[in-house]
Amino acid sequence: MGYLHVLAQRGVIHATWVSALEPVSSNLAAMGDCLRSLRSKGESFLPAPRNILRAFRYPFDSVRVLIVGQDPYPTQGHPIGLSFAVDHKVRPLPGSLQNIYTEYRSDLNLDPPQHGDISLWSERGVMLLNRTLTVRPGIPSSHRGLGWEEITQTAVRALAARDVPLIAILWGRHAQELKSVLQSDRVAILESVHPSPMSATRGFFGSKPFSKANDLLRDLGSAPIDWRLT
């Protein structure tokens, strides 16, 4: 049995992702070896191993919106394997997520929840994917270049190659590096600066990504996303 089939059998990824990730099956196996090696040397990483591939736990064919992040929050107990999401118990919320919620309220006239677990979106067709899937605690971007980028780029390329609509929401420079693999008549791209407190005032606020994504889905003949979190 191949490596990806084993991951699917264990519930680490959804079975529908096996074919899409086949070109990087050996890369994924190598990343597993790399992380085990780091741990054997006493180096920790986030998120918890069971959540590293969580973004791939939802059906490949169900993805209608892709939201790309940079890498997991580097704070212990925060990241849960989905871009911008944090564990339900985390307080205060990270600045980027607070800004996402500010724009969410402004764009949709909906009240965001008090918690930061936005995994409900994943169940409704929104893939929350980081470019880099692990990080060293306390050191942002510390696993950039370790090998995750080719894996996540392959996943995004596979999504774009389907014959179904996809709206890609690219916040910030690292996410926008994926534009070249998202060129398709069935893909629409929404981009702005990152929601980080350092950049949100330079174009994230007022960008209306949620309502624009739904408008584009309708234009492409697909059902809109139910963005409600409460």
UniProtKB/Swiss-Prot annotation:
NCBIfam families: PRK05254.1-1, PRK05254.1-5, ung. It comes from the Bacteria. Keywords: Cytoplasm, DNA damage, DNA repair, Hydrolase. HAMAP family: UDG. GO terms for biological process: base-excision repair, AP site formation via deaminated base removal. It is an enzyme of class 3 (hydrolase). One of its GO terms (cellular component) is cytoplasm. Its main location: cytoplasm. Excises uracil residues from the DNA which can arise as a result of misincorporation of dUMP residues by DNA polymerase or due to deamination of cytosine. It comes from Tropheryma whipplei (strain Twist). Its EC number is 3.2.2.27. Gene3D superfamilies: Uracil-DNA glycosylase-like domain. It catalyses: Hydrolyzes single-stranded DNA or mismatched double-stranded DNA and polynucleotides, releasing free uracil. Pfam families: UDG. This is Uracil-DNA glycosylase.
